[in-house]
């Protein structure tokens, strides 16, 4: 006996030393020997496989001899080895699964709760240390694992009928990293979730009832997106209940694959037993940033029904109806949701609604769900975007039935709004489809005005209303809401657009009189209404002159005095004084009594003129070289027959050369006729570029003087008087160019 003990391998000795003597069923491994065994296998990883194989051999012997205590010690040793040697789990995990499978299949011991509980602890230790890298490509391990888990579920549920132990197994499976991403093992996730929900409904009957009732309309808006958990249905024993803990492990996770599978299992359960309390309770456990997935998957259930309708297959209207009700229940609950794509969900619900227009319950529930989407504000322009989207869809729909459905959807949303959330542009888009709800639309319109053109559309909207009572209420609301900015643009609008008496014109003046605080203005408006007359500008100027508000009075006077009211509404929306507006008609000034030629001479005789003063500048008019015929006519008639002045574009020296050549040719044709050729410098300069003036100022020649212009405080160029006795010199001689301006224009002689 001693000789056999001497030749026993060390790893077997260390394992055997961990087992206490005796046949007691509640044995525990020896602590010191177990610690040394753990140290041994941890420092010599090559011994792990030998230890695991020996444990299988020893367990097989213990099972055959019904040594329950030794089996319990083996299971505890396995749990400790897994926990301390998890880095090398792939070395021995298959042997451990084989060992546990031997225990489960032994009918003489698999009905012992103590043994199965220890086995569950060992299984949980393995699950917590499993990773996709261990089993991703190992088909043998996956097959063994699936077989073991299925057998474990069967033993616990059928032989032991232990619900808590079953829930513990579900919790163990939830700790496996990446199990939802593996196509061969992800079936375990919905199986565990359904098991936990069944247990929750069995223990708490309120989660099993059909409680889908239409929610009352909420006119009070919640604050912007909340991020803290709200109070939902409380369960007193939730913290200590394994079914609640199991659901927490599957739903309170950031693994989207696992969460997706878990929510699908929840929706499947809710289709058979619709219960909004169950939906709210579980949704509250989902991380707030991922709760929108519940709404998306419920919406997908509704879209599947719409696709079935399109393909011709029989859909389930009750399933779509329940899904819509569940969405509404979640949207109006106190559960916080962030990141919800409101427009995308609304468009999908609208598609189902229009495809199912024959089913009135489904159409109505779609409308309720769309309205509930706007129950919480996820971003500032949410309501406006929803209404704009409906307006665009209404304009594109040709079917009248579908158009009426969309208009009713729009009314349903508007009826649920209690705060100003739409702008004036959207208001003018909505009114043509909701003529009976003009007052309500005005009440939910923001006070901010984007621009002057918006006000014109606002007045036009009031003019398009057929009911006079509605017109009167609408105009009063407009003045109450935009009192500070509507008065002057309104005066400008009605002066420009109203040529014949109409009721809206008098409504404006009634409210304008109240705003200005002029009683006589109000009574005069009533007389004009009775007589069917319009105000003259002089009458309105009198009232604005006597206005209590001087700012309104001054701007109103300027509007009335301007020609054809050529003032932008944008200028009327600010507090700056208006810029003067000039009439396009000629002014009746003293210049108007002077003939055009005299006006031209007066302008030419001004001490300083720039290019902008005369359209015949040398830079903007094409230069014309004088011809011999022009000179002949000038000699005969004393003036040019053409109104266009003779100009030259050459330099001074080349210009003198050209003129000398022309003179010689002229003498040859008119022998003996002494003609007096006028020096170009005798005429006044018609236009000089500003840059040329600057050059002339920098190099003052003897032919120019500088005069200080008192009115403009700038140096003006005045050409010097040229002696009429000056004669041209031949081009062969050197010519000194004293003038620095190259663009003088010759006036007609």
Curated annotation (Swiss-Prot):
Chain spans, region Disordered: 633-652
GO biological process: protein localization to plasma membrane
Compositionally biased tracts (Polar residues): 637-652
Residues spanning the membrane: none
A Gene Ontology cellular-component term: plasma membrane
UniProt cross-references to Pfam families, sorted A to Z: EFR3
InterPro entries given in the database record: EFR3, EFR3_HEAT-like_rpt
Family: Belongs to the EFR3 family.
Protein name per the record: Protein EFR3
């Amino acid at each position: 006996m001693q000789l056999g003990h001497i030749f026993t391998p060390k790893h077997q000795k260390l394992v055997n030393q961990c087992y206490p003597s005796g046949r007691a069923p509640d044995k525990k491994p020896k602590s010191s020997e177990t610690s040394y065994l753990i140290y041994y296998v941890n420092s010599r990883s090559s011994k792990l496989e030998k230890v695991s194989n020996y444990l299988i051999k020893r367990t097989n012997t213990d099972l055959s001899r019904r040594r329950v205590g030794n089996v319990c010690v083996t299971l505890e040793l396995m749990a400790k080895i897994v926990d301390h040697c998890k880095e090398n789990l792939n070395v021995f995990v298959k042997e451990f699964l084989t060992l546990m499978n031997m225990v489960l299949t032994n009918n003489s011991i698999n009905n012992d709760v103590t043994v199965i509980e220890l086995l569950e602890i060992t299984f949980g230790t393995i699950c917590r240390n499993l990773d996709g890298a261990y089993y991703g490509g190992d088909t043998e391990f996956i097959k063994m694992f699936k077989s073991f888990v299925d057998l474990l579920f069967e033993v616990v549920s059928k032989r032991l009928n232990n619900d808590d132990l079953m829930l513990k197994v579900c919790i163990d499976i939830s700790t496996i990293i990446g199990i939802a991403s593996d196509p061969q093992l992800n079936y375990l996730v919905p199986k565990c979730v359904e098991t936990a929900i069944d247990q929750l409904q069995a223990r708490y009957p309120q989660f099993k009832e059909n409680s889908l009732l239409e929610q009352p309309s909420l006119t009070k808006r919640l604050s912007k997106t909340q991020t803290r958990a709200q109070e939902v249905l409380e369960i007193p024993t939730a913290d200590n209940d394994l079914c609640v803990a199991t659901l927490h492990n599957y739903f309170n996770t950031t693994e989207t694959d696992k969460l997706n599978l878990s929510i699908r299992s929840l929706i499947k359960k809710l289709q058979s037993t619709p219960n909004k309390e169950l939906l709210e309770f579980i949704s509250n456990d989902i991380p707030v940033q991922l709760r929108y997935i519940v709404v998306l998957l419920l919406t997908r259930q509704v879209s599947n029904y719409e696709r079935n309708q399109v393909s011709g297959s029989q859909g389930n209207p009750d399933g779509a109806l329940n899904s819509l009700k569940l969405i509404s229940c979640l949207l109006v609950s106190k559960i916080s949701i962030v990141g919800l794509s409101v427009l995308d969900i609304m468009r999908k619900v609208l598609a189902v609604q229009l495809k199912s227009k024959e089913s009135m319950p489904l159409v109505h529930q779609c409308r309720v769900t769309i309205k509930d989407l706007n129950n919480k504000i996820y971003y500032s322009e949410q309501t406006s975007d929803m209404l704009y989207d409906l307006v665009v869809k209404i304009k594109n729909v040709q079917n009248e039935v579908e158009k009426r459905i969309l208009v009713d959807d729009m009314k349903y949303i508007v009826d649920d709004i209690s705060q100003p959330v739409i702008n004036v542009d959207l208001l003018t888009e909505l009114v043509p489809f909701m003529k009976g709800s003009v007052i309500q639309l005005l009440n939910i319109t923001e006070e901010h005005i984007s621009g002057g053109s918006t006000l014109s559309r606002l007045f036009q909207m009031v003019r398009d209303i057929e009911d006079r009572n509605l017109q009167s209420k609408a105009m009063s609301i407009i003045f109450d809401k935009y009192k500070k900015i509507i008065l002057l643009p309104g005066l400008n609008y009605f002066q420009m657009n109203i040529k014949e008496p109409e009721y809206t014109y008098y409504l404006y003046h009634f409210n304008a009189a109240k705003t200005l605080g002029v009683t006589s203005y109000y009574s005069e408006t009533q007389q004009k209404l009775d007589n069917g007359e319009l105000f003259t500008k002089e009458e309105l100027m009198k009232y604005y002159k006597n206005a209590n508000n001087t700012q309104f009075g001054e701007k109103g006077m300027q509007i009335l005095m301007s020609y054809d009211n050529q003032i932008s509404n944008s200028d009327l929306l600010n507090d700056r004084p208006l810029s003067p507006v000039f009439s396009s008609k000629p002014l009746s000034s003293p210049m108007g009594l002077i003939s055009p030629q005299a006006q031209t001479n007066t302008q030419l005789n001004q001490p300083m003129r720039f290019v902008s003063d005369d359209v015949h500048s040398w830079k903007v008019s094409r230069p014309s070289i004088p011809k011999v015929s022009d000179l002949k006519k000038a000699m005969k008639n004393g003036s040019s027959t053409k109104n266009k002045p003779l100009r030259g574009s050459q330099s001074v020296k080349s210009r003198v050369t050209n003129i000398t050549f022309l003179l010689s040719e002229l003498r040859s044709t008119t022998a003996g006729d002494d003609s007096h050729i006028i020096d170009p410098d005798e005429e006044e300069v018609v236009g000089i570029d500003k840059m040329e003036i600057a050059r002339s100022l920098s190099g003052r020649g003897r032919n120019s003087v500088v005069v200080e212009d008192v009115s403009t405080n700038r140096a003006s160029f005045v050409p010097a008087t040229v002696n009429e006795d000056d004669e041209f010199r031949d081009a062969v001689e050197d010519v000194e160019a004293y003038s620095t301006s190259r663009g003088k224009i010759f006036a007609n002689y």
